[in-house]
Regions:
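Carbohydrate transferase catalytic cores enriched for Leloir-type hexosyltransferases
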Residues: 1-357
Length: 357
């Protein structure tokens, strides 16, 4: 009988990250905790993080600090889910690297730039394997880091079954079902909120509005005020976000760069018509389930939004395309692929092989 695989996971961001990356990591962790083939240790340096982890995940795991990963026989494999490798480790390591935007679109401030780039650079140099989300992101990693050659694999995410069509949702009082364009996660420049704000200002009428989940940066917020656009920013729980997806007239993803793009797939799974940029990984991710547009073509965005809001059969056709795209995905593929990669790493390691003897 095979020994239990001693899996350590960098847990630093679990208490803070509940967005796409955090949701994916939680699914992997919960699956590993429920599988007797794994003995899970969560690595967290801060006491406050350790308390938060116990509150969320109970007593089913061991707890340790990151320094324990440097001991040669402490673990059979270490997983770094947070887009980089924060510390070194002696065991075989898998780093999930969603993107390298810290290098292609570096922060203007030197200290912040180094803080964002250092874990990615360490991953490229030291990780045993790197898992990324798409062909596009793999190519970006390999073009940026020669050291990553030969160790990058694709483990594509998919929305969990939580994201599904339904009815009976309660929306915020200022939001009218079917009468809004939804934008999720807009603070970063590459999210390109500017194009959508200008398009909505030209296209929306009457009680129609732009709803933003996750907030805008100060420049984009000023642009909304100058345009006179009816818009609202909402801090949404997963339950509220699902309700907003289900009832949106259109979900818009105008990003100029995405390593994958989970938002359009979540929206499709919930039955929303999706309009997305034709840039970076989004054509690969949406797979024919979205209307794709040049991210800088404001008139085309305005025209497309107006047509979808005015033409229910057109919107219904786009919904059907979205459902078909999601149906073709392996909804558990990211979790299974990540754990299989970790098993392969461990079973090739001499320490794990010694324990088989």
């Amino acid at each position: 009988m095979s020994p239990v695989l001693r899996l350590a996971i960098d847990a630093a961001n679990f208490p803070r990250d509940r967005r796409g990356m955090g949701r994916l990591a939680r699914e992997v962790l919960r699956t590993a905790l429920a599988d007797p083939a794994f003995e899970v240790t969560l690595l967290a340096a801060k006491r406050s993080d350790a308390r938060a982890l116990r509150a969320e995940f109970g007593e089913r795991y061991r707890a340790a600090g990151p320094l324990s990963a440097r001991k040669r026989r402490a673990y059979d494999a270490v997983w770094f889910p947070w887009n980089g490798m924060r510390f070194g480790c002696a065991a075989p390591s898998l780093v999930t690297l969603h993107d390298v935007f810290a290098f292609s679109e570096p922060h203007r401030e030197r200290i912040a730039r180094r803080r964002e780039q250092a874990p990615i650079l360490r991953a490229a140099r030291e990780a045993t394997r790197i898992a990324t989300d798409s062909t596009w992101s793999r190519d970006q990693i390999l073009a940026t880091f020669a050291a990553a050659s030969g160790k990058v694999e694709i483990v594509a995410p998919a929305p969990s079954t939580y994201w599904s069509a339904g009815s009976g949702d309660v929306l915020p009082p200022q939001v009218a079902a079917g009468r809004y364009v939804l934008l999720v996660g807009a603070r970063e420049k590459r999210k390109n909120a500017r194009t959508l704000i200008a398009a909505c200002a030209a296209a929306l009428r009457g009680d129609e509005s732009l709803v933003i989940v996750g907030g805008l940066g100060p420049e984009d917020r000023a642009l909304v005020l100058r345009s006179g656009l009816r818009a609202g920013e909402i801090a949404a729980s997963d339950r509220m976000l699902r309700a907003l997806y289900r009832n949106a007239g259109v979900v818009a993803v105008p990003s100029t760069a995405e390593g994958f793009g989970l938002v359009p797939l979540e929206a499709m799974a919930c039955g929303a018509p999706v309009v997305a940029s034709d840039a970076s990984a989004l054509p690969e991710t949406t797979g024919g389930g979205a209307l794709l547009l040049d991210p800088y073509d404001v008139p085309r965005w305005a025209q497309s939004l107006r047509r979808l809001l005015d033409d229910p059969p057109r919107a219904e056709d786009l919904r059907a395309r979205g459902f078909a795209r999601v149906a073709a995905l392996d909804r558990d593929g990211f979790t299974r692929g990540t754990l299989e990669s970790l098993r392969r790493l461990a079973t090739r390691d001499e320490n794990f092989v010694d324990r088989l003897a």
